[in-house]
Curated annotation (Swiss-Prot):
It comes from Bartonella quintana (strain Toulouse) (Rochalimaea quintana). GO terms for molecular function: rRNA binding; structural constituent of ribosome; tRNA binding. Part of the 50S ribosomal subunit; part of the 5S rRNA/L5/L18/L25 subcomplex. Contacts the 5S rRNA and the P site tRNA. Forms a bridge to the 30S subunit in the 70S ribosome. One of its GO terms (cellular component) is ribosome. This is Large ribosomal subunit protein uL5.
Amino acid sequence: MAEEKQTPRMKTRYFEVIRKTLQEKFNYKNAMQIPRVDKVVVNMGIGEATIDSKRPSLAAEDLGLITGQKAVVTRARNSIATFKVREGMPLGAKVTLRKDRMFEFLDRLVTIALPRVRDFRGLNPKSFDGRGNFAMGIKEHIVFPEINYDKVDQIWGMDIIVCTTAKTDDEARELLRAFNFPFRS
């Protein structure tokens, strides 16, 4: 018997509520003009990678647990002597999420992880790049429920980039606000 796949909450909300709201607010002529979240890139840069080359693979395992997708170990493109970095040396890990996994991750980020961040006052509404993409940083990866706090030997930060099809920052801001992203006012 085939198992029925469940649609992520945020995806359902996007197609049933958010699209109509954005259509009314920005008066799009075509349904394809309505902005949507294209992909989410989660990156961990490990500063101690020059000392211990096993750290990026440990970070990749944690990132895989957080996102539900296998992480890729990122390597140095060229050597930088002042940072003791050689070309090809592992420096971190990254994951690119699309479709259902992306919506599931955004749901966990907004509802569980961000409220657990220490001294959280909201996301900076100026962190858009001018083309509708939003970037944010989290200082501790242990805010995600998938990480067992007792088994963690090192706490790493991570960068989360939300890429949208929005043409302007205002459109992207409204899209993410509709997804309940807690922006500072």
